[in-house]
């Protein structure tokens, strides 16, 4: 028998409704038998003492009592006693100033209570200072000097000394100066020093010098000096050892020199000894100022480069008349006594310290370099009239002092710019 669709739908609906009703009945029966197990924690009856405040819970009322009794503040913290070092009081005789006395700014007060004593101890650590008050009411500068050292003070006035040893080689016909040491009273920062030795005989003189060393109170050279000298010229020869300095501007100065006779009586050969250098008093310069220039030689191109940098302390009899006028430098290249070529720098306004920064180039073969020289003339010229010479100097092996040493340094160091200051002569 085939059932129709409406009958099947009606049966399904009735079955579903019956199931729902049965489930509801079972649920009610369970709640009736166990009423507390089916409730959530928030649905249970809360303990009034342990109840948590909620949104639906009634606000709790507090009883507030007003009182007019004064409120006592908390007691201050009591720090333990601090025992710090007291300021060291320097005696007046140590400062060596009789008109001053040492006092402290601590105010004395009678302790009234233990609390006051504690406060005074704390205040002493902060407010106690050391002051110097004059007795006569006049405030002057007080200078506390370091402890006097007699040995150091004696070295200030001590003359420079030089240690050396002389030996003569008959086969090579040379005089050797070794074991070179120099002791000076002071040293200048940034300065180098070297020893220059020269032997003078009837036919001429020869020179040699050591390498530059950092100047110190005690300077030692590992190298020595070798001076060619014939054995027959030894009794009449005179050796001069000069201690020189060179600053960062390539300015050379003499600390002292020592002259020795090589006859064998005053200085024995083969014995090391100390000699005191004689310092000459510096006379006021009679020159017309100084000029700073650098020279270099390029062997591959056969070119001599002369760079005129600047001059300083230019003065002459006509300096007032030439003030504000033009100043230039004329450079002349000479081979022995013959003038090869001359060039002139640009003109600069006549000041005490004019600046040029100009390079002049000469073509010169390598075989003529040692016998050549460079002559400088500083010229001042007004708007009208001839130029006036303010000073001159000459560089070459024929010269002496810094002019000769500058040329020798150029020969030893090709392709290198070497700058030095040179004194101008009238």
UniProtKB/Swiss-Prot annotation:
Membrane-crossing residue ranges in chain numbering: 7-29
Vesicular domain ranges by topology: 1-6
CDD domains (UniProt xref): C2B_Synaptotagmin-13
Bilayer topology term: Single-pass membrane protein
UniProt keyword annotations, A-Z: Cytoplasmic vesicle, Membrane, Repeat, Transmembrane, Transmembrane helix
Subunit structure, interactors included: Interacts with NRXN1.
Cytoplasmic side: 30-426
Domain notes from UniProt: The first C2 domain/C2A does not mediate Ca(2+)-dependent phospholipid binding.
Subcellular location field: Cytoplasmic vesicle membrane
One GO BP: vesicle-mediated transport
Primary location recorded for the protein, binned into one broad class: membrane
Cross-referenced InterPro entries: C2_dom, C2_domain_sf, Syt13_C2B
Tissue specificity statement from the Swiss-Prot or TrEMBL entry: Expressed in brain, heart, spleen, lung and testis.
Gene Ontology annotations for the cellular component aspect, listed alphabetically: cytoplasmic vesicle membrane; plasma membrane; transport vesicle
Species of provenance: Mus musculus
Record family assignment: Belongs to the synaptotagmin family.
Domain of life: Eukaryota
C2 domain boundaries: 158-275, 287-422
Function: May be involved in transport vesicle docking to the plasma membrane.
SUPFAM superfamilies, per database record: C2 domain (Calcium/lipid-binding domain, CaLB)
Key word Membrane present: yes
Name under which the protein is recorded: Synaptotagmin-13
């Amino acid at each position: 028998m085939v059932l129709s669709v409406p009958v099947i739908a009606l049966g399904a609906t009735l079955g579903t409704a019956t199931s729902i009703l049965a489930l509801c009945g079972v649920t009610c029966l369970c709640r009736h038998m166990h009423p507390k197990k089916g409730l959530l924690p928030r649905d249970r009856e809360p303990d009034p003492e342990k109840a948590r405040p909620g949104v639906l819970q009634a606000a709790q009322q507090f009883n507030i009592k007003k009182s007019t009794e004064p409120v006592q503040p908390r007691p201050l913290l009591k720090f333990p006693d601090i025992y710090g070092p007291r300021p060291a009081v320097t005696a007046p005789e140590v400062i060596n100033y009789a008109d001053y006395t040492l006092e402290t700014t601590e105010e004395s007060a009678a302790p009234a209570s233990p609390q006051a004593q504690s406060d005074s101890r704390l205040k002493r650590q902060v407010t106690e200072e050391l002051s110097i008050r004059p007795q006569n009411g006049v405030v002057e500068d007080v200078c506390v000097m370091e402890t006097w050292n007699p040995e150091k003070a004696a070295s200030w006035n001590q003359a420079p000394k030089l240690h050396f040893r002389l030996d003569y080689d008959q086969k090579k016909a040379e005089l050797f100066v070794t074991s070179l040491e120099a002791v000076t009273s002071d040293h200048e920062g940034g300065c180098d020093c070297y020893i220059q030795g020269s032997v003078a005989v009837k036919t001429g003189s020869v020179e040699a010098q050591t390498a530059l060393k950092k100047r110190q109170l005690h300077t030692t050279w590992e190298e020595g000096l070798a001076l060619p000298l014939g054995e027959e010229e030894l009794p009449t020869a005179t050796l001069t050892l000069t201690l020189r300095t060179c600053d960062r501007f390539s300015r050379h100065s003499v600390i002292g020199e020592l002259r020795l006779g090589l006859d064998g009586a005053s200085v024995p050969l083969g014995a090391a000894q100390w000699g005191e250098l004689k310092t000459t008093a510096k006379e006021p310069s009679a020159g017309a100022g100084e000029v700073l220039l650098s020279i270099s030689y390029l062997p591959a191109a056969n070119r001599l480069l002369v760079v005129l940098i600047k001059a300083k302390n230019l003065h002459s009899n006509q300096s007032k008349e030439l003030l504000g006028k033009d100043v230039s430098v004329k450079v002349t290249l000479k081979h022995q006594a013959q003038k090869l070529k001359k060039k002139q720098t640009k003109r600069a306004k006549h000041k005490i310290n004019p600046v040029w920064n100009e390079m002049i180039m000469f073509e010169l073969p390598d075989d003529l370099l040692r016998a050549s020289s460079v002559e400088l003339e500083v010229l001042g010229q007004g708007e009208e009239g001839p130029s006036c010479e303010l000073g001159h100097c000459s560089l070459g092996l024929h010269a002496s002092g810094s002019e000769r040493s500058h040329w020798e340094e150029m020969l030893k160091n090709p392709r290198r710019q070497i700058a030095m200051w040179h004194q101008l002569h009238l």
